[in-house]
């Protein structure tokens, strides 16, 4: 079965625009990216484009591929304490010399837009409200959009990443 996500995306964007217009604050996204991955460049470009369509300002912090962990930790601490920044994400993957999970865990859980801090993952795994990883949430919402129930069905997920496979399972 192949699902067309375009109608869902259009409906979701409309819903988000309405919800954003009701807020007293303007959300602001900070993206931390380390050079060296062309796919990441494309993903970040798409995120910036969608945020622009929604009127959400984005700040991109782009680091050289040989950046040290301490430099990124300092930037995350700065963004955590900045009240204007409401969401932070680290564009994955990072170069091998950087510990992805350690750096992700430096993000305040309530600013963790990818839902990848141990705090959010732990709450989610216990059935307690948490910020969910966005791709699995989008998959579930897409299934709901088309009234497709997975209850009682066998589903094969070919992915074991913390961002997609594990939360989706």
Question: What is the predicted role of each segment?
Answer:
Residues 90-155:
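Anion-binding alpha/beta catalytic cores of soluble intermediary-metabolism enzymes, centered on
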Residues 53, 78-80, 107-110:
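Non-catalytic terminal and connector segments of soluble metabolic enzymes
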Residues 51-66:
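Short beta-strand elements in bilobed, periplasmic/extracellular small-molecule ligand-binding domains
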Residues 1-25:
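Positively charged, low-complexity intrinsically disordered leader regions
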Residues 34-48, 133-169:
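Glycine-rich phosphate/diphosphate-binding loop of Rossmann-like nucleotide-binding domains
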Residues 26-36:
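Short beta-strand segments enriched in small/hydrophobic residues
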């Amino acid at each position: 079965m192949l699902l067309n996500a375009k109608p869902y995306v259009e409906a979701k964007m409309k819903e988000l625009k309405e919800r954003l217009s009701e807020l007293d604050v303007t959300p602001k996204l900070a993206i931390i990216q380390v050079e060296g991955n062309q796919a990441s460049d494309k993903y970040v470009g798409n995120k910036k484009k969608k945020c622009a369509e929604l009127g959400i300002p984005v700040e991109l912090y782009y680091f050289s591929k040989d950046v040290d962990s301490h430099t990124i930790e300092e930037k995350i601490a700065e963004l955590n304490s900045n009240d204007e920044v409401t969401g932070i994400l680290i564009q994955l993957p990072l170069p091998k010399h950087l510990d992805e999970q350690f750096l992700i865990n430096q993000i305040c859980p309530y600013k963790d837009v990818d839902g990848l801090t141990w705090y959010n993952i732990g709450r989610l795994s216990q059935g307690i409200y948490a910020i969910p990883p966005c791709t699995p949430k989008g998959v579930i919402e897409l299934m709901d959009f088309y009234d497709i129930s997975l209850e009682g069905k066998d589903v094969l997920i070919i992915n074991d990443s913390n961002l997609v496979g594990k939360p989706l399972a």
